Regions:
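Thiamine diphosphate
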Residues: 2-180, 185
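Glycine-/acidic-rich phosphate or pyrophosphate-binding loops and their flanking alpha/beta elements
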Residues: 24-38, 59-60, 165-176, 186-232, ...
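Short beta->alpha junction loops
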Residues: 71-72, 240-242
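Hydrophobic, well-ordered secondary-structure elements that form the walls
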Residues: 81, 146, 212, 229, ...
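Active-site proximal loops enriched in glycine and acidic residues that flank catalytic Cys/His/Asp
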Residues: 181, 214-216, 241-242
Length: 242
C-alpha cells in the first residue's frame, strides 16, 4: 500500500471541502458547525474529550460558552445532553463510535430516546476507520444498536456535501439522531446543490445488471467496484446510497 493510500484510509490527508479535493467526514462536520451555530441559538456542542478529533475548533472559538467537554465519560455525556434538551437546548454530542453507542447505551436508550429528545449524537471513527487506535476503538456494532432504539434515526452520509445537508436536517428533525462517521477521506459524489431527504436513497450510478446497496464510505468502494465490473465484464451495476 502506498503512503497516499495509507493516509487516505487513516483520514490524515490535508483536505478542503471542494469538489476537486477530498475531505474526511469529521472535517466536513467541523466546517459547517459554526454556520449551524449561527442559525440555531439553542445549539450546544458537547464532547467526551474528543474536541480535536471531532474538529469542533471553529465552533469553539466562535461560541466558547456553547461548548462543553464532559471528559472521557460517555454515560455522562448522554445524560447531560438529555438534561439540556429537556431545558430547551439542541445538543450535539460527539464521541468515538463504539463509545457513543456501547459504553452509554442505557443512557441513549432511556434518557434520550424514551423521551424522544432532540439530541444529535455524532459517532466518529466508525467501522475499522479508527483501527490505528486498536480493536477497542473499532465501531462495528453501533448502527445495529442505535437502530434498535425507539424514536432514533440513524444516518451514515458518505459525501462531504451530503454530511453538511444531513446535519442540518438532523437539527430540524426534533428527535434523536445518530450520525455515523468514518475517518477516511472521500471525494464528493453529488453536486453541492443536490437535494437530500432522510430515509430516501440516492443513486450515484445507474445500472440494470445488478445493484450495490450501501451507505457511508462503502458507497465509494461500491462505485469503484461498479466501474471495474463495467471495464472488465461490460456489466452495468447500480449503486444505491442509503
Amino acid at each position: 500500500m502506498s503512503d497516499a493510500q495509507d493516509k487516505l484510509l487513516q483520514g490524515e490527508m490535508n483536505m478542503t471541502l471542494n469538489m476537486t479535493f477530498m475531505t474526511s467526514a469529521r472535517d466536513a462536520v467541523g466546517k459547517c458547525l459554526a454556520e449551524l451555530g449561527d442559525k440555531h441559538d439553542d445549539m450546544l456542542v458537547l464532547t467526551a474529550d474528543v474536541d480535536t478529533s471531532s474538529r469542533i475548533q471553529a465552533f469553539k472559538e466562535k461560541y466558547p460558552d456553547r461548548c462543553y467537554n464532559v471528559g472521557i465519560a460517555e454515560q455522562n455525556l448522554m445524560s447531560v445532553s438529555a438534561g439540556l434538551a429537556h431545558e430547551g437546548f439542541r445538543p450535539l454530542a460527539f464521541a468515538f463510535a463504539p463509545f457513543a453507542s456501547m459504553r452509554c447505551y442505557e443512557q441513549v436508550r432511556t434518557d434520550i430516546c424514551y423521551s424522544k429528545l432532540p439530541v444529535v449524537i455524532i459517532g466518529n471513527g466508525a467501522g475499522y476507520s479508527n483501527g490505528a487506535s486498536g480493536c477497542t476503538h473499532c465501531g462495528l456494532e453501533d448502527s445495529a444498536l442505535m437502530v434498535a432504539c425507539d424514536n432514533m434515526t440513524v444516518l451514515e452520509p458518505g459525501d462531504p456535501f451530503q454530511i453538511a445537508k444531513l446535519l442540518e436536517a438532523a437539527m430540524d428533525l426534533n428527535a434523536p439522531v445518530y450520525i455515523r462517521l468514518g475517518r477516511e477521506a472521500a471525494s464528493s459524489l453529488y453536486p453541492e446543490d443536490a437535494k437530500y431527504e432522510i430515509g430516501k436513497a440516492m443513486i450515484p450510478r445507474e445500472g440494470d445488471d445488478g445493484a450495490f446497496i450501501c451507505s457511508g464510505i462503502m458507497v465509494h468502494f461500491a462505485m469503484e467496484a461498479a466501474k471495474r465490473i463495467h471495464d472488465e465484464l461490460g456489466k452495468e451495476i447500480r449503486v444505491v446510497d442509503m
